[in-house]
Amino acid sequence: MSDILKIGKYEFTSRLIVGSGKYPDFQTTRDATLASGAEMITVAVRRVNIMDPNEENLMDYFKDTDVKILPNSAGCTTAEEAITLFRLVREATGIDIIKLEVIGDTAKTLYPDVMETLKACEVLAKEDFTIMAYTNDDPIMAKRLENAGAHAVMPLAAPIGSGLGVQNRYNVVFVKDAVNVPVIVDAGIGTASDAAVAMELGADGVLTNTAIAQAKNPIAMAEAMKHAVIAGRMAYKAGRIPKKPYATASSPLEGLIEF
């Protein structure tokens, strides 16, 4: 049975999105991405070349694949910077699906500036971009981003690169309940079990970069993430049993042999 992830006009069979940072070279980036089964790889346009054909270009490593490049605005601290960047990206590459992130704290937490993100979202939506908006795990802001035109919201699990996993499970559920667009848990994933937890909570997908790129064996971790996302999604759809404080016998008490 198909289980398609729809983000705006785009459809994906994989619910795992990977990043492109912190790899030693583009070939390793390619190998890990293909091992993950992901159909999108996000790229910090201000740090990784996808626009200059005269320099080594990450897009060249994925031309023979079905992996879609997802430009992001990492490094931007204002709405204006992000808007300008994405206009340049679309002009140079034709890519119109984007990961919008505007960072408020560049020193320690890399938390998003949600008000600047919201301003950028309003403008870019009017220009027909397909917007995936990185935000905090706040259902109110998630709904505002949806109303502003975001096609997916991406609440953080924990600070970017921290590897802490999902720190507030209830907020993931609250965000999921608040919006009618896909919820992609982004940032803070440390290992495969973190991805599975996010999916079990009802997230529509997971984005991870550091957990794969900085693993001792990135290819093996990419494969682990692939299976974790699938397992978490299957468990969510299957429906977990309720948690109870006391035991419940798994075998019936009726018909016991009397001694």
From Swiss-Prot:
Transmembrane domains' residue ranges: none
EC numbers for this chain: 2.8.1.10
Pathway terms, separated by semicolons: Cofactor biosynthesis; thiamine diphosphate biosynthesis
Catalytic residues as annotated in Swiss-Prot or TrEMBL: K99 (schiff-base intermediate with dxp)
Localization per Swiss-Prot or TrEMBL: Cytoplasm
Catalytic activity: [ThiS sulfur-carrier protein]-C-terminal-Gly-aminoethanethioate + 2-iminoacetate + 1-deoxy-D-xylulose 5-phosphate = [ThiS sulfur-carrier protein]-C-terminal Gly-Gly + 2-[(2R,5Z)-2-carboxy-4-methylthiazol-5(2H)-ylidene]ethyl phosphate + 2 H2O + H(+)
Gene Ontology process terms (BP): thiamine diphosphate biosynthetic process
One cellular component (GO) term of this entry: cytoplasm
Main location: cytoplasm
GO molecular function, one term: thiazole synthase activity
Origin superkingdom: Bacteria
Keyword set, alphabetical order: Cytoplasm, Schiff base, Thiamine biosynthesis, Transferase
Residues at which 1-deoxy-D-xylulose 5-phosphate binds: G161, A187, G188, N209, T210
Function: Catalyzes the rearrangement of 1-deoxy-D-xylulose 5-phosphate (DXP) to produce the thiazole phosphate moiety of thiamine. Sulfur is provided by the thiocarboxylate moiety of the carrier protein ThiS. In vitro, sulfur can be provided by H(2)S.
Subunit structure: Homotetramer. Forms heterodimers with either ThiH or ThiS.
Similarity comment text for this entry: Belongs to the ThiG family.
Protein name: Thiazole synthase
Originating organism: Nautilia profundicola (strain ATCC BAA-1463 / DSM 18972 / AmH)
Gene: thiG
